[in-house]
Regions:
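Alpha-helical transmembrane segments of multi-pass small-molecule/ion transporters
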Residues: 1-314
Length: 314
């Protein structure tokens, strides 16, 4: 298993090197801070949607396969969300704290997952990874926002609190969802490869992940780490260990291939989404704790992801 760990660690290490490099670049001010804000918009509206459309539109997929993938990944989501709620009750956490723990346990950094899937499996890894994205993004957002809406008594007025309808409307406009949905339509109808469109989106998509990983690193704020240890440990154990373990056993019980299982486990094993901070701030949850969970999970995942994938390889 040690040899598998080292081999996988070396294969996916460029992903984490780019994250570290992004953080170092922000610290020394090269490029200027304004660059990261502009690049985030470029990534969100152009590069990642192009990447997702390019790969999803060329994948062969049936509705049965899609249903199986949904059962596998959503089983893990259900377990960790439930356990985070139970942990919040057992430890007597305020809604502000346990909703941050829940976000840290349930949400996923899809960009790190896509980068790892691409490093290990190339284009077919990116294509299947995009399918798991389209399953997870709507469900996670609806579950998280509905829970936070019903449990958090925050000081801001109701007008500034997103409702479920706001979330659904944002999901409909989400460029990732639109790109994947368009790609799925083309895939299901069996349309021919459109050379101009696919070559263009392929070129744009090739720039997406490197810039995205640098941006993830640039947005990590180590100085803002909280000293509230127990909630961080709970969220990290649930996200980095429990989530992928549950997904692995469900995938095995449903006879998914090793490739399909590995992609599902990668999405389960990556750290929580950086956007969790924005949602915590909107709802008046514990933002410093959320920042700490995000930062520490990224650091821990450097080790936990290769270990989990090495276990799969054996």
């Amino acid at each position: 298993m040690l040899s598998n760990f080292l081999e996988i660690f070396l294969l996916i290490s460029p992903v984490f090197i780019l994250i570290i490099l992004g953080n170092l670049l922000r610290r020394i001010g090269v490029p200027e801070l304004s660059f990261w804000h502009v690049s985030d918009k470029l990534i969100y509206w152009v590069l990642i949607p192009a990447l997702l459309f390019h790969h999803v539109s060329q994948i062969t997929l049936s509705s049965t396969m899609l249903a199986n993938y949904a059962v596998v990944i959503l089983s893990g989501l259900f377990v960790v969300t439930t356990l985070s709620f139970i942990a919040g009750k057992l430890f007597g956490y305020t809604p502000q704290i346990w909703t941050s723990v829940m976000q840290g346990s349930a949400r996923h950094n899809a960009f790190i997952a896509l980068a790892i899937a691409g490093s290990l499996f190339g284009n077919k890894g990116l294509a299947l990874g995009a399918i798991f994205m389209v399953i997870l993004i709507p469900v996670i957002n609806i579950v998280i926002v509905s829970t936070m809406t019903s449990t958090l008594n925050q000081e801001v007025g109701n007008n500034s609190r997103p409702s479920i309808f706001d979330v659904l409307f944002e999901l409909i406009k989400n460029p990732f969802i639109l790109a994947i949905a368009t790609g799925l339509v083309i895939s299901f109808v069996g349309a021919e490869r459109i050379i101009i469109i696919h070559e263009t989106t392929g070129l744009l998509g090739s720039a997406a992940l490197p810039i995205m990983l640098l941006s993830i690193g640039a947005n990590i704020k180590i100085r803002e780490i909280s000293l509230t240890i127990t909630p961080i440990i709970i969220a990290s154990v649930l996200k980095l260990l429990v989530f992928p373990i549950v997904v692995f056993f469900v995938a095995k019980s449903m006879n998914l291939s090793l490739f399909e299982t590995t992609i599902a486990v990668i999405f389960a094993a990556v750290p929580t989404a950086a956007s969790s901070y924005s949602l915590a701030k909107q709802f008046g949850a514990e933002t410093q704790l959320m920042t700490s969970i995000i930062t520490i999970q990224v650091a821990l995942s450097f080790i936990t992801i290769p270990i989990i994938l090495a276990f799969l390889a054996t």
